[in-house]
Swiss-Prot record:
Summary of the function given for this chain in its UniProt record: Part of the ABC transporter complex PhnCDE involved in phosphonates import. Responsible for energy coupling to the transport system.
Name the UniProt record assigns to this protein: Phosphonates import ATP-binding protein PhnC
Major location (coarse): membrane
EC number, as in UniProt: 7.3.2.2
Transmembrane segments: none
GO cellular component term of the entry, any: plasma membrane
Entry-linked Pfam families: ABC_tran
Membrane-related topology note: Peripheral membrane protein
Location within or outside the cell: Cell inner membrane
Domain of life: Bacteria
Subunit structure: The complex is composed of two ATP-binding proteins (PhnC), two transmembrane proteins (PhnE) and a solute-binding protein (PhnD).
Length: 275
């Protein structure tokens, strides 16, 4: 008699898996405390919490901009907790990182700023990026232009970065991250300094990339209305710990109060500012 039992289907490897992750800075500050978090490849996750809750430190650990003190951290199944040197650069190449401060080269054009992210693919990296970006191939320039098209600012390709509005600069930063061909997006307060309309455009852009390119997104936000509108999950942090992880429909006023504590006005103040 033949055995007709089928082998169990293998579950897809998560984009991020952190287990009991800790980050303690030299001054003794415990910024991340026993954090366990899994982000799957089909997820758009919003992380909320007051200033100092550990949101930025968590993202910086995931991108290995800082080294976790203890615990384990995996990116697409690879343990990156203790890697160093060239290995860190390889890992960062898989991660599209977007910051509140846009980190553009202000005197370069929009297209040149996007091309800067291609330098890791260019074996002739010598000297300053301001010189190098003018020596990219036609194919690379066309690819960078396509990234600008995806975020809706291709018409600004030849303007200097320092002539753009905040929302436009943030979309340049997103296009630059796209040009890395990342496997995941991490965004640290990407709309904190933007007006409500620009904030919505930036969040729509991230969601479009998530849906069309199937790239997982983990984004830190102060704006609770944006967090619930775009996130498929809401992760609440307080004092370095994850204290809630719920669907947006389950984020009640009581949970928000629990996340923000005595700083609850900070949460609702941000919400009112974007009303």
């Amino acid at each position: 008699m033949h055995n007709t039992t089928r082998p169990a289907a293998r579950l897809p490897v998560p984009a991020i898996r952190a287990h009991q992750l800790n980050k303690i800075y030299p001054n003794g500050t415990r910024a991340v405390s026993d954090v366990s978090l899994t982000v799957h490849t089909n997820e758009f996750v919003s992380v909320i919490g007051s200033s100092g809750a550990g949101k930025s430190s968590l993202l910086r650990c995931i991108n290995r901009l800082i080294r976790p003190t203890s615990g384990t951290l995996e990116l697409f199944g690879e343990d990156i907790t203790k890697i160093s040197g060239r290995h860190i650069r390889q890992v960062r190449g898989k991660v599209g990182m977007i910051f509140q401060q846009f980190n553009l080269v202000r005197r370069l054009s929009v297209l040149e700023n996007v091309l800067v992210s291609r330098l890791r693919f260019n074996s002739s990296f010598i000297g300053h990026c301001c010189t190098l970006v003018r020596h990219f191939s036609r194919n690379e320039k066309e690819f960078a232009f396509e990234c600008l098209q995806q975020v809706g600012i291709e018409h600004l390709a030849f303007q200097r970065a320092d002539t753009l509005s905040g929302g436009q600069q943030q979309r340049v930063a997103i296009a630059r991250a796209l040009a890395q061909e990342p496997e995941i997006f991490l965004a640290d307060e990407p709309i904190a300094s933007l007006d409500p309309h620009s904030a919505e455009v930036v969040m729509d852009t991230l969601m479009q990339i998530h849906e069309t390119r199937h790239i997982p997104v983990l984004v830190n936000l102060h704006h609770i209305d944006f967090a619930t509108r775009y996130g498929k999950r809401i992760v609440g942090m307080r004092k370095g710990k994850i204290i809630h992880d719920v669907p947006p429909s389950c984020l009640t006023d009581d949970l928000i109060t629990d996340i923000y504590g005595a700083r609850i006005n900070e949460a609702f103040g941000e919400l009112a500012a974007c009303a």
